[in-house]
């Protein structure tokens, strides 16, 4: 894994047949990515996999060696197909069972009378895992080494990220600027490539769009060096003016 301050990276593993089938649209990647960006962690890979134990184990074992942080979403609920916790235990060769602290949290949250088998299942995880507290619905996520296991429900996941801020050691904050223009990609491809060659430590992406009846392209400029972003944007604006391409917005 890359441990330098200059670059800290992460991957997300989305676990769930409902995502792969198209029944549910994932929004957690956007939430986690924006949060990581603020912490100076670059999201470099996202995988969507099914609720199959071997697939989870294989994917996590591969990514935990490759990235500083791995975030999993989904599969830690009360039903039979929620198998992420058990799979993570096997990936790390750890004992799986009732986590004492998680059990106590859930028993208190639901009350003994309503603390049924399904709810107790949410306390089952690697027994030596660190917990990620859940201010929304009680059931905690957990951490093993550099793997962070979160629920798939977007609102709950988002509420849990705040408690992780001090656990994530990021690199330099990543700054972003966007320039939108009214043109087609082919008109700016060559000069944009020349700018990218000049600013090798800046990531430049171009994304075509169609809105309000107009065709356009958004250029997203990203770097941990704010001055380089500003200089890069000046170069882009300069060639846009030379080519008389209308800017639709800059932020």
Regions found by a protein language model. Name each.
Residues 146-239:
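An accessory alpha-helical subdomain
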Residues 2-46, 51, 227-230:
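Glycine-rich phosphate/diphosphate-binding loop of Rossmann-like nucleotide-binding domains
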Residues 239-251:
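Conserved short beta-strand edge segments in small beta-sheet-based binding/regulatory domains
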Residues 30-83, 89-90:
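N-terminal small/polar loop signature for handling phosphorylated ligands or for N-terminal nucleophile
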Residues 12-15, 20, 69-74, 147-149, ...:
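Short glycine-rich or small-residue beta-strand-to-loop segments that form or flank ligand, phosphate
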Residues 17-18, 75-78, 154-156:
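Short glycine-rich anion-binding loops that position phosphate/pyrophosphate groups of nucleotides
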Residues 58, 65, 83-171:
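Proline/glycine-rich low-complexity loops and linkers
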């Amino acid at each position: 894994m890359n441990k330098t301050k200059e670059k800290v990276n992460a991957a997300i593993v989305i676990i769930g047949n409902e995502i792969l089938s198209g029944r549910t649209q994932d929004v957690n990647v956007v939430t986690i990515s924006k949060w990581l960006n603020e912490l100076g962690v670059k999201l470099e890979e996202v995988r969507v996999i099914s609720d199959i134990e071997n697939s989870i184990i294989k994917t996590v074992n591969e990514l935990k060696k490759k990235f500083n942080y791995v975030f999993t979403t989904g599969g830690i609920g009360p039903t039979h197909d929620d198998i992420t916790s058990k799979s993570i235990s096997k990936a790390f060769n750890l004992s799986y069972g009732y986590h004492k602290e998680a059990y106590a949290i859930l028993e208190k949250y639901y009350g003994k009378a309503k603390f049924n088998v399904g709810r107790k299942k949410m306390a089952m995880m690697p027994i030596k895992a660190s917990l990620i507290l859940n201010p929304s619905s009680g059931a905690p996520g957990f951490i093993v080494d550099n793997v962070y296991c979160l629920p798939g429900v977007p609102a709950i996941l988002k509420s849990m990220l705040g408690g992780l801020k001090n656990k994530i050691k990021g690199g330099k904050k990543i700054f972003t600027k966007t320039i939108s223009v009214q043109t087609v990609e082919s008109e700016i491809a060559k000069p944009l490539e020349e700018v990218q060659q000049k600013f090798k430590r800046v990531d430049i992406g171009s994304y075509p769009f169609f809105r309000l009846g107009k065709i356009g392209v958004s250029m997203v400029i990203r770097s941990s060096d704010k001055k380089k972003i500003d200089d890069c944007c000046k170069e882009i604006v300069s060639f846009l003016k030379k080519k008389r391409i209308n800017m639709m917005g800059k932020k």
